[in-house]
Design a protein with these regions (language model features):
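Transmembrane-helix signature of 12-pass secondary carriers
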Residues: 1-221
Length: 221
């Protein structure tokens, strides 16, 4: 983990009257959470881009078959359940191991299982991967918010909360760009085009390398 000193509690120390007064450690915590939420937004919408054609491919039926809509919905429902459970699960881990360490685990979780979705051969394998990836996404929302609440001054929390929401929207935009690229590839080869969208979800794992090196634990933890 980071060799940086622990981030001073948000409720102690010199009063912060402007963003320039924030410490480097506080900025790093904010950037880590922001990037985590950005990749959350990206990952959440990757599946929706290819749900119909990919599930049809897994079921070996046409895209207009009623089974495609049914199993696509089941997979999405499993994702939402995982998202709901992830906050409590990784929130508890954050209490035990620390916020920055838990943040690393959440990002690795959704990056790993999003990437593994590429190899799914049945609808239930895809559902399992999406459920496990959602645990990481739900956990990242909770852990990232906790990290900021323990490191950023109270007066700046509404501002950083709004900024985190912008990260999600940018992530969704990146997912749309990915969808355009996939549609271009699919025009020439559909065999792997719809699967390949999930490989983009591996990218957040690179963020872990920086978090482990640069983001310290909150002092109060």
């Amino acid at each position: 983990m980071s060799t940086e000193p622990a981030v001073r509690s948000a409720e102690t120390g010199q009063e912060v009257t402007s963003l320039r007064d924030l410490s480097p450690q506080q900025w790093k915590s904010g950037i880590a959470a922001w990037l985590g939420w950005l990749f959350d937004g990206l990952d959440m919408h990757l599946y929706t881009l290819v749900a119909t054609p990919f599930v049809a491919q897994l079921l070996q039926v046409g895209q207009t078959d009623d089974a495609v809509g049914y199993y696509s919905s089941v997979i999405q429902a499993a994702f939402l359940v995982g998202w709901a459970l992830g906050g409590g699960f990784f929130g508890r881990i954050g209490d035990r191991l620390g916020r920055a360490r838990a943040l690393v685990l959440t990002i690795l979780t959704y990056a790993l299982f999003t990437g593994l979705s590429f190899f799914a051969q049945t609808w239930w394998q895809l559902m399992l991967c999406r459920f496990l990836a959602a645990l990481g996404i739900g956990g990242e929302w909770a852990v990232g918010a906790s990290l900021l609440s323990e490191t950023w001054p109270r007066r700046w929390r509404p501002w950083i909360a709004a900024t985190l929401q912008s990260a999600v929207n940018i992530g969704v935009l990146l997912a749309m760009v990915t969808g355009v690229l996939v549609s271009i590839v699919a025009a020439s080869s559909e065999t792997y085009a719809y699967r390949s969208v999930f490989l983009v979800g591996i990218l957040p794992a690179l963020l872990v390398l920086w978090i482990r090196k640069a983001v310290p634990e909150p002092e109060e933890w």
